[in-house]
Regions:
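Acidic/polar loop-and-plug regions of large Gram-negative outer-membrane beta-barrel proteins
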Residues: 143, 152-213, 225
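Short sequence motifs at beta-strands and strand-loop junctions characteristic
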Residues: 3-5, 65, 93-96, 130-134, ...
């Protein structure tokens, strides 16, 4: 975690941060084009829809993207890989966190078609003061892989509209002591407070970044991977 806001997380490979690590979703790079960072709050629903995750550590002749120093993380969402079925779940956590998820997978039909759909909504107050947030996730995928064929087609569309308040300042122990109601308060946040009886933050993150991908996989023979 960094900052304490929802989704303000990070991943390090071999000691290198995300600016030196390529993150791919169905082969599409999603690192920021200007600074190389990745904002996980934009891809919150990936944990619910991923059918596979591939990690290559360090420099190498990767076939997925330009090699990076830290490595490459490839996240796959294939409809034909999911078994038939559906589910509805409700999750409740500390600090007012709740998440509702509904999903359905058609499974692979005799003709080779498969469909997956997922919708979810979350909200929470955040562990740090004045870091509440709310968001919704959407995902749909259509796959086609007939029996005996060396070709597999997959179309995916996903996104995670969200907003959340952040804490992006370095807080000293003295600040924790001075502003805590009962001694040291690790939840104290100088970026926010109350305005007209409602939570207010000078650091409000809001985004919706839909991603559509189309993949055509051709397996020439069993010796090639």
């Amino acid at each position: 975690k960094q900052g304490g806001g929802y989704g303000d997380s990070r991943i390090s490979l071999r000691g290198f941060d995300q600016t030196n690590t390529s993150i791919l979703i169905n082969g599409q790079p999603v690192n920021d084009m200007e600074n190389g960072r990745l904002y996980w709050s934009n891809w919150q629903g990936l944990t619910d829809v991923a059918s596979g995750i591939q990690i290559q550590r360090g420099l190498g002749a990767t076939k997925l993207a330009v090699p990076s120093v830290g490595g490459t993380i490839s996240i796959l969402t294939k409809a034909v890989d999911k078994e038939k079925g559906g589910s509805i779940s409700q999750m409740i956590g500390n600090d007012g966190y709740s998440k509702t998820v509904a999903s359905y997978n058609s499974g692979k039909s005799e003709s080779g078609w498969a469909t997956s759909v997922l919708l979810s909504k979350w909200s929470g107050n955040g562990y740090v003061n004045n870091t509440s947030g709310e968001g919704f996730n959407y995902f749909t995928a259509i796959g086609y892989a007939p029996e005996g064929s060396k070709h597999e087609l997959n179309f995916s569309f996903l996104g995670a509209g969200q907003w959340h308040h952040q804490r992006d300042v370095w807080v000293s122990i003295r600040d924790y002591q001075n502003f805590g109601d009962e001694g040291i308060d690790q939840r104290w946040n100088s970026n926010g407070g109350t305005l007209d009886g409602e939570e207010f933050s000078m650091r409000r993150n809001f985004y919706n970044k839909p991603l559509a991908t189309f993949n055509w996989d051709y397996k020439i023979n069993s010796k090639l991977k």
